[in-house]
């Protein structure tokens, strides 16, 4: 069995994108930051959230005869939060329209999960709690948009 020697010095057509061996390796914080800011990660958050919601709803429908089947709603709530985090972080900043959409998704999903009706009987995602988070979302959005401008 013979081996083929590796060709030295052959450049690629996109040599400007080649990784230089003389550059310092990325720190763990930089690697995690790059991963969390990638579009694939953000789309993955939305997909995982949808899978959690669908799975929880399948189990809730089949467990409707059980008395304490509410614990099966936990993955659905986590999935809705996961979807909203994905929506908010798709382009690095959160517009007021996106935040309003996320508030509606969270409130409606809790309404459907708790008693199957949209009757505004929320206990977790109430208007007061979601409105209290407006400042946090706005400051995170400003911070992310400033980071995007510097890059």
Curated annotation (Swiss-Prot):
Superkingdom classification of source: Bacteria
Coiled coil feature spans: none
Main location: membrane
Membrane topology type: Multi-pass membrane protein
Ranges for region Disordered: 1-20
Subcellular locations according to the entry: Membrane
Keyword tags: Membrane, Transmembrane, Transmembrane helix
Cellular component GO terms, alphabetical: outer membrane
Keyword Ligase attached: no
Any Pfam family matching the protein: CRPA
Membrane-spanning parts: 43-63, 70-90
Protein name in the entry: Sulfur-rich protein, serovar E
Organism: Chlamydia trachomatis
């Amino acid at each position: 069995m013979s081996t083929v020697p590796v060709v030295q010095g052959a450049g690629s057509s996109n040599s400007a994108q080649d990784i230089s061996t003389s550059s310092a390796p990325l720190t763990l914080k930089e690697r995690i930051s790059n991963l969390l800011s990638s579009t694939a990660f953000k789309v993955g958050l939305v997909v995982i959230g949808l899978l959690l919601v669908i799975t929880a709803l399948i189990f809730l429908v089949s467990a409707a005869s059980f008395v304490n089947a509410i614990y099966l709603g936990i993955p659905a709530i986590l999935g809705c939060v996961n979807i909203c985090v994905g929506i908010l972080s798709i382009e690095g900043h959160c517009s007021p329209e996106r935040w309003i959409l996320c508030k509606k998704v969270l409130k409606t999903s809790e309404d459907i999960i708790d008693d199957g009706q949209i009757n505004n009987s929320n206990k977790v995602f109430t208007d007061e709690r979601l409105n209290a988070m407006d400042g946090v979302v706005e400051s995170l959005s400003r911070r992310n948009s400033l980071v995007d401008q510097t890059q």
